[in-house]
Amino acid sequence: MMNIDDTTSPMAHPIGPSQPPSDQTKQDPPSLPQEAASSVSADKKDLALLEEKPKQSQEEDRVDTGRERLKKHRREIAGRVWIPEIWGQEELLKDWIDCSTFDTCLVPAGISSARTALVEEARRAASASGGLHNRCLILR
């Protein structure tokens, strides 16, 4: 009795009456006519294609990470996007970048004057004592 085991391959496996059907890893070479042999080779090609599909899906899964998708997108889009030199709203950008009006409000003037006062006080104390040793500490 001949049976085709769909789980392993489309090739024919002999199954005896005392032998239950099972997954057989050993395959007998086909003794089929020329037409059947060509269909078997076509089936082998189909199996090879099916084996390649999981490999391709694994590559697609690897590409699905955010960083890989961004790299792929940059490669695909490079050269197709036109970036204009002038877009007509540069004045608004310059106004937004200029933060001098905020800087005066955020940095109090008293900080710089307090630092200056401390430096002057240290210089007066050093000159009053007349020691060269104290001057070296101030200049550091």
From Swiss-Prot:
What keywords is this UniProt entry annotated with? Nucleus
- Looking at the UniProt entry, the stretches that span the membrane are none
Question: InterPro entries annotated for this entry?
Answer: BIC
Amino acid composition bias (Basic and acidic residues), ranges on this chain: 42-68
Give compartment(s): Nucleus
Q: Which domain of life is it from?
A: Eukaryota
Q: What happens when the gene is disrupted?
A: No visible phenotype. Bic1 and bic2 double mutants have a blue light-hypersensitive short-hypocotyl phenotype and an increased anthocyanin accumulation when grown in continuous blue light.
One of its GO biological process terms is: blue light signaling pathway
Q: Where is the composition biased (Polar residues)?
A: 1-10
Q: Please list where the region (Disordered) is annotated.
A: 1-71
A single GO CC term for this protein reads: nucleus
Q: Which CDD domains match?
A: BIC1_CID (cd22645)
The record describes its quaternary structure and partners as: Interacts with CRY2 in both darkness and light.
**Functional note:** Regulates the blue-light dependent dimerization of CRY2 and formation of photobodies. Interacts with photoexited CRY2 to inhibit its activity. Inhibits CRY phosphorylation.
Q: List the protein's name.
A: Protein BIC1
Q: Which organism is it from?
A: Arabidopsis thaliana (Mouse-ear cress)
